[in-house]
């Protein structure tokens, strides 16, 4: 009897290990490949596309137009750093003090959860993982973050982030966002336009760059102040991000 009970557990354990090994090879290959090759699509884009098809929205197309950092306004990179991760050039994928503050805040305010994901973590999550909150997903995100921080330069992480970030319903990447909202290429985005796009990033399906709420305008102004405090364009040059 004991052998019959153990056998299925052994099989499941081996199956799980094989699945994890296959995922490790897949993700590791993706990290290596996308260190030099433009990213054609992300997990978030695939998830949105499949969801649209299942809902009968066959006209929905989730895609992004890849552009190099040379074709992105330096204000855009600075805006997302100012908004999302001001220690981006310094850390190895995780902002520990910010995580500690977020945990303390969430213990006091269970109804208003605060995140502390760095740009590196967001890039790993958007590129390779599914939406949702779980310890398994967080563990995978941490491993993938370490992977891209080890293999990619900070400039590459920022470039990929800007090309796969969601800026609205079906709008992925800064080039698509610049064309949709401002009718210009990403290379010509101004300070205020870059800050406005960065302002919707916490929830691009709720906040609208083409119809900004008072909160979005307030956040845009705050981001512009942070951009000045970081040192403007010189911040990007000093940290070899443009």
Curated annotation (Swiss-Prot):
GO terms assigned for molecular function: pentosyltransferase activity; peptidoglycan glycosyltransferase activity
**Any one cellular-component term (Gene Ontology):** peptidoglycan-based cell wall
Q: How does it sit in the membrane?
A: Single-pass membrane protein
The annotated pathway is: Cell wall biogenesis; peptidoglycan biosynthesis
Query: Which GO biological process entries does UniProt record here?
Result: cell wall organization; peptidoglycan biosynthetic process; regulation of cell shape
Q: Any S-S bridges, and between which cysteines?
A: none
Record keyword Transferase present: yes
Keywords (A to Z) from UniProt = Cell inner membrane, Cell membrane, Cell shape, Cell wall biogenesis/degradation, Glycosyltransferase, Membrane, Peptidoglycan synthesis, Transferase, Transmembrane, Transmembrane helix
Per the entry, what this protein does is: Peptidoglycan polymerase that catalyzes glycan chain elongation from lipid-linked precursors.
Q: Tell me the protein family, please.
A: Belongs to the glycosyltransferase 51 family.
- Please identify the protein, giving its name as recorded: Biosynthetic peptidoglycan transglycosylase
Gene source species: Salmonella paratyphi B (strain ATCC BAA-1250 / SPB7)
- Lineage, broadest ranks: Bacteria, Pseudomonadati, Pseudomonadota, Gammaproteobacteria, Enterobacterales
């Amino acid at each position: 009897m004991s052998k019959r009970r153990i056998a299925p557990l052994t099989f499941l354990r081996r199956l799980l290990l094989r699945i994890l090994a296959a995922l490790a090879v897949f993700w590791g290959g993706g990290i290596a490949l996308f260190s030099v090759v433009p990213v054609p699509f992300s997990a978030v884009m695939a998830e949105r596309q499949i969801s649209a098809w299942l809902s009968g929205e066959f006209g929905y197309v989730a895609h992004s137009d890849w552009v190099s950092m040379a074709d992105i306004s330096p204000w855009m990179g600075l805006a997302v750093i100012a908004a999302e991760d001001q220690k981006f050039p310094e850390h190895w994928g995780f902002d520990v003090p910010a995580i500690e503050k977020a945990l303390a805040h969430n213990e006091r305010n269970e109804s208003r959860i605060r995140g502390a994901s760095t740009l590196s973590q967001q890039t790993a999550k958007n590129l390779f993982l599914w939406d949702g909150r779980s310890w398994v997903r967080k563990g995978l995100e941490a491993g993938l973050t370490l992977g891209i921080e080890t293999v990619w330069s900070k400039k590459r992480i920022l470039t990929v982030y800007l090309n796969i970030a969601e800026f609205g319903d079906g709008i992925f990447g800064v080039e698509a966002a610049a064309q949709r909202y401002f009718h210009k290429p990403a290379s010509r985005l101004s300070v205020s336009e870059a800050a406005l796009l960065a302002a919707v990033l916490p929830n691009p399906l709720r906040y609208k760059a083409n119809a900004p709420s008072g909160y979005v305008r307030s956040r845009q102004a705050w981001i512009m102040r942070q951009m000045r405090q970081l040192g403007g364009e010189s911040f990007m040059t000093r940290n070899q991000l443009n």
